[in-house]
Every structure is written in C-alpha cells, then in structure tokens.
C-alpha cells in the first residue's frame, strides 16, 4: 500500500504536489530543460527518470501508465518516439540538475533541470578518435622513455670506465 511522503510537500496537499510534478515533467519533456527551484528539481528528477524508463520499454502498458500522469498526448508521443529511443543504451541518469543561484524576488535557490543528451554517432566517433589519440600519445611516451633509460644506463658505465682509467 502506498504511503504518503513524510515532511512538507510541494504546494501543500498531496494532490497539488502530484499535479505540480506532472506539469513540471510535461514541461521538461516538451522543452528539454526548465528553470525551477532546487527543491522542485530534486523532487522532479526521479519522477521524470521513471517516465523515461517507461518510454524506453515502449509497450502499450507503459504508454497507458504514462498517459495517466501526463495527459497531453503530443508530449507522450514525443516521449515515446524521440526521448525514449534516444536513451536506449543508457542505464539511467537521463537528467542533470545545475544550480544557478538565487531568485531575485524572494532569494529562493534556483536550478536548471535538463535532459542529458545521448551520445550521437558523431560524438561517439569523436570520443573514439580522442581515445586513439591518447593511446598513441601514451605509446609515443613509452617509446621516448625507453631510450632515455638506455642513455642513463650507458652514462654510469662510461663513468665507471673513466674511474677505472684514473685508478
């Protein structure tokens, strides 16, 4: 049996909090990023991530569950056709919260919550190229370090030979 959340709720009553989170999630999926208070952003994050996980599954049952929360069919359509497939290979962490300072009027701490962009093919190719560059740089460093060690080894031998000549 579901238990009500302990402590203060956003907006006063449980029903108002439920509607507030649904509207915040709708705006987040519609615009990709929204500016809100830190408290609302922290409450929205797990709520929105559960909806994205349902969208990733993409079956009728999950679509109907999301439609119970977000009543705008166009937003649900974009959630299931664009946002869900975008995070197909991502196991979680679909949102990011960035603090942006306090609001001017009431000094409330504000934050931006946004959908994290999934890696596109171009970004993956760039990442692979950077990894290859780093690997080649490490290989080059290893090659330059190996001759340096050989040079260091020859110096003590030369010094030892000079010392034996002096004796």
From Swiss-Prot:
Pfam families: Ribosomal_L17
Keywords in alphabetical order: Ribonucleoprotein, Ribosomal protein
Keyword Transcription on entry: no
An individual GO BP term: translation
GO cellular component annotations of the record: cytosolic large ribosomal subunit
Comp. bias intervals (Basic and acidic residues): 131-167
PROSITE patterns found in the cross-reference section: RIBOSOMAL_L17
Molecular function per GO: structural constituent of ribosome
Span list, region Disordered: 124-167
SUPFAM superfamilies cross-referenced by the UniProt entry: Prokaryotic ribosomal protein L17
Subunit structure: Part of the 50S ribosomal subunit. Contacts protein L32.
Family (UniProt): Belongs to the bacterial ribosomal protein bL17 family.
Descriptive protein name: Large ribosomal subunit protein bL17
Organism: Streptomyces avermitilis (strain ATCC 31267 / DSM 46492 / JCM 5070 / NBRC 14893 / NCIMB 12804 / NRRL 8165 / MA-4680)
Lineage: Bacteria, Bacillati, Actinomycetota, Actinomycetes, Kitasatosporales
